[in-house]
């Protein structure tokens, strides 16, 4: 499908069932989540993670050191297993995936990360 002009694009973006509308709504949702997290502040600490080749990841920490976020993306077209030990999560904290809005259970040893999926794992989720 080739969208030829702005008006046509805007119609597709308004349609919640169109591929463009779905992507647009997800981008807005992610921007809102990201904007609410202190660890995503421009002056927050950031380090890249040393992960297997199938993943790209980085760790961010808020300036007050109260929030950490591990951002990990599966760069392949196959499901990959991410071991919890690869992230060095602090065990006495509750960790959540901001994008899935789910708690990471303390007994979990690994996550199955779908192709091209991204995780934002945090110890201190701020409400959107």
Set out the residue ranges of the language-model regions.
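Carbohydrate-interacting/catalytic domains
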Residues: 4-128
């Amino acid at each position: 499908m080739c969208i030829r002009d702005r008006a046509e694009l805007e119609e597709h973006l308004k349609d919640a069932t169109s591929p463009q509308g779905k992507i647009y709504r997800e981008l807005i949702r992610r921007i809102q989540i990201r904007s609410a997290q202190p660890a995503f502040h421009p002056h927050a600490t950031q380090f890249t993670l040393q992960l297997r080749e199938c993943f790209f990841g980085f760790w961010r920490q808020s300036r007050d050191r109260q929030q950490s976020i591990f951002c990990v993306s599966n760069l392949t077209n196959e499901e990959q297993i991410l071991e919890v030990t690869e992230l060095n999560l602090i065990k006495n904290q509750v960790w959540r995936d901001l994008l899935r809005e789910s708690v990471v259970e303390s007994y979990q040893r690994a996550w199955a990360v779908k192709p091209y999926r991204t995780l934002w794992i945090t110890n201190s989720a701020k409400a959107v």
